[in-house]
Structures are given as structure tokens and as C-alpha cells.
Regions:
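N-terminal active-site beta-alpha-beta segment that forms phosphate/nucleotide-binding
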Residues: 1-102, 107-110
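Conserved phosphate- and dinucleotide-binding cores of soluble alpha/beta proteins
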Residues: 83-143
């Protein structure tokens, strides 16, 4: 087993144990920052639909504290590309080839103002350990 695979397994186990300790207030610093920096215009926020004991971003969207917030979820394409399409609370989601939920009806894709990026861990140099697909790394390198 490669080192990254071992780390993914280790940190997934840790995240699973800590998942139920996360409170709604977890997002308060982010809410304050967004409201302070973007109070005059709409904010295009990309996120992920939570799965596998990830921080429940749905709680953030339901708070209503962020004014003029537009949510965009990733959609994965056949060529290993990822794009972000708008999603509203009652919009239909479909399961993609990796078992993740993504918008079923696609809007124009956008480059988000702010991105919430899933991760398993990060190190002292702020290197992110994701799930190994490289989608976010490719997206960030492109944009």
C-alpha cells in the first residue's frame, strides 16, 4: 500500500470518529468572512454535497446568514474534467460514476468566487490530501 493510501485510510478513520462532534457553529467564521467581504454582491460559492462523514455543508446553506449566496456543486465529465453548476435546495441530484451526488439539470458552469474543497487531511505546508482522483487539483491548476 502506498504512503498516500495509508494516510487516506488513517485520516478517514479519524474523521469518522470526529464527525458527530461538528456543530453548526463550525461554519460561523466562514459566514462572517463571506458577509464582510462580499456584502455588496452575489457570492458564487462552490461546495460539495457531503458524503462519507464530510463536514455537512448543507448546514451552512440552511443558516440563511449568508446573503445573496449562490451554491454551485461539482459535475464530473468523462475527460476527468470538473465544472461547477448552480444548485438550489430542492433541485434534483443524480449519482455520478463515483457515487457522488451532482446536479441533474446543468446550468452554465462558472468559476466560483469561493471554493469549499473536501479533504481528508493537510500538512504543515498546507498540502491537501484528497481522495486521490485529482479533480480539484486539475481544476485549481486550470483556473
Amino acid at each position: 500500500m502506498h504512503n498516500k493510501d495509508r494516510l487516506r485510510k488513517k485520516y478517514f478513520f479519524i474523521r469518522k470518529k470526529k464527525y458527530f462532534e461538528i456543530k453548526s457553529s463550525f461554519f460561523n467564521p466562514l459566514i462572517k468572512l463571506i458577509n464582510k467581504k462580499h456584502k455588496e454582491r452575489h457570492v458564487n460559492l462552490s461546495s460539495y454535497y457531503p458524503a462519507s462523514f464530510e463536514a455537512n455543508t448543507l448546514k451552512l446553506f440552511e443558516t440563511g446568514f449568508i446573503k445573496k449566496l449562490r451554491i454551485f456543486l461539482p459535475v464530473l465529465k468523462e475527460n476527468n474534467a470538473m465544472y461547477f453548476h448552480e444548485w438550489k435546495k430542492n433541485d434534483v441530484l443524480k449519482i455520478n460514476q463515483f457515487g457522488m451526488l451532482e446536479p441533474a439539470i446543468l446550468s452554465n458552469h462558472i468559476v466560483p468566487d469561493i471554493m469549499l474543497i473536501p479533504l481528508l487531511a493537510y500538512d504543515k505546508q498546507n498540502n491537501r490530501l484528497g481522495y486521490g482522483g485529482g479533480f480539484y487539483d486539475r481544476y485549481l491548476n486550470k483556473y
